Amino acid sequence: MKTQTVLFSFFLVLLLVATQTEGGILDALTGILGKRALRNQNFVDYAYDPSLSAADWRALETLLEDY
């Protein structure tokens, strides 16, 4: 029982150290590159497709209405 408790405590501390190190690395990268550089700013580009007509939207709605 002592061995299990010691191993559990050791791995818990090891996990805490690993997560703190990961947070420090991310903070350092954010400081170096800036917060804007780490954001994906292209995710909205695919939200609107001007090539789709009203008929295309109606066809999509009928295809997806039972989904």
UniProtKB/Swiss-Prot annotation:
The alphabetical list of record keywords is: Amidation, Antimicrobial, Antiviral protein, Secreted, Signal
Q: Where is the signal peptide?
A: 1-23
Modified residues annotated as Leucine amide in this record: 33
What is a biological process (GO) this protein takes part in? regulation of defense response to virus
A Gene Ontology CC term for this entry?
extracellular region
Per the UniProt entry, the disulfide pairs are none
Residue ranges annotated as propeptide are 37-67
Question: Localized where?
Answer: Secreted
Answer whether the UniProt record assigns the keyword Signal to this protein.
yes
Tissue specificity: Expressed by the venom gland.
- Family assignment? Belongs to the non-disulfide-bridged peptide (NDBP) superfamily. Short antimicrobial peptide (group 4) family.
Q: What else is known?
A: Shows a low ability to inhibit hepatitis C virus (HCV) infection in Huh7.5.1 cells.
**What's its job?**
Antimicrobial peptide.
Q: What is this protein called?
A: Peptide Ctri9293
Q: Which organism is it from?
A: Chaerilus tricostatus
Taxonomy of the source species: Eukaryota, Metazoa, Ecdysozoa, Arthropoda, Chelicerata
